[in-house]
Amino acid sequence: VDPGESTFIDEGATGR
């Protein structure tokens, strides 16, 4: 899992 994916899972799209 790259940083964008983990933020997507955690915050709902913030890292995308």
From Swiss-Prot:
UniProt modification remark: Conversion of fibrinogen to fibrin is triggered by thrombin, which cleaves fibrinopeptides A and B from alpha and beta chains, and thus exposes the N-terminal polymerization sites responsible for the formation of the soft clot. The soft clot is converted into the hard clot by factor XIIIA which catalyzes the epsilon-(gamma-glutamyl)lysine cross-linking between gamma chains (stronger) and between alpha chains (weaker) of different monomers. Forms F13A-mediated cross-links between a glutamine and the epsilon-amino group of a lysine residue, forming fibronectin-fibrinogen heteropolymers.
Superkingdom in the source lineage: Eukaryota
BP GO terms, sorted: adaptive immune response; blood coagulation; innate immune response
GO cellular component terms given for this protein: extracellular region
Subcellular location: Secreted
UniProt entry keywords in alphabetical sequence: Adaptive immunity, Blood coagulation, Coiled coil, Disulfide bond, Hemostasis, Immunity, Innate immunity, Secreted
Role description: Cleaved by the protease thrombin to yield monomers which, together with fibrinogen beta (FGB) and fibrinogen gamma (FGG), polymerize to form an insoluble fibrin matrix. Fibrin has a major function in hemostasis as one of the primary components of blood clots. In addition, functions during the early stages of wound repair to stabilize the lesion and guide cell migration during re-epithelialization. Was originally thought to be essential for platelet aggregation, based on in vitro studies using anticoagulated blood.
Domain commentary: A long coiled coil structure formed by 3 polypeptide chains connects the central nodule to the C-terminal domains (distal nodules). The long C-terminal ends of the alpha chains fold back, contributing a fourth strand to the coiled coil structure.
Assembly description: Heterohexamer; disulfide linked. Contains 2 sets of 3 non-identical chains (alpha, beta and gamma). The 2 heterotrimers are in head to head conformation with the N-termini in a small central domain.
Name of this chain's protein: Fibrinogen alpha chain
Species this chain originates from: Oryctolagus cuniculus (Rabbit)
